[in-house]
């Protein structure tokens, strides 16, 4: 059974694989950048970001020497900025510890900041041809259906079990084509809903299809609580300039944005702001609400325009200057909404 699975999948992949710029290279640095960008972001959306990033930082050394703000600016719009910070720190680590050359062993790659087993496996198999499994959601789904596994794929022990199955399937075969074949199969045919079994190159070996469970499997039950948060978000202006701060920590660490507090009233906002910055505000107008959804939380930002009557020590920006800053996607939404209503 196994030999037919591998031959069928690799033959199908070689004929039908999708064409993306990061698939045209064996450069581990480029593959690493693409894999990090593809986390939590759709493939089509990544293409222009990847292209710009690689054109600007075509070597690890250039990335390591860049400022974090420059890296964030190129990342702007992709979200999950912690990924960009880890990339920057990891590039510096590689320059300091590997003479600017990307590591060549699975262990060394896995030890890099921001890289987990899937990304390490993908880099090793695609760049170096190693027989290392790359287990993402697509692979978990395919293997669960192929072997009709009833285990919860959200659990680490199930993921370990599937990794072992893939490791055995890889022995003696083109690891790069096999791993990428699984990814492409999951993205285009063996999809979460309504799998296109009639087009699947390995459907004749699929136990879930055989017992009519392909739309039921895999079992995936996650215990995640999604938070709903309400903020008063302040558009604070002095004449035609805007007050923005660089977030020192948290979800939007190092990104620029408007000041906001998890409060229920703009008047409480004014009190909190004056207490923190020793500067009085005047309430000008209300501009509605903007929602921004993160993976495990949703922000409901209630937008109020405040003004300050005199110059302060805090940094103020003209609109054209804001466009040059690495601003969080959530607060770019706020600004766009405000300007539309202004």
Which sequence ranges carry the predicted segments?
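Catalytic cores of DNA base-excision repair glycosylases
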Residues: 3-8, 12-196, 202-211, 278-280
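Intrinsically disordered, low-complexity, charged terminal extensions of DNA damage-control enzymes
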Residues: 1-19, 24, 187-342
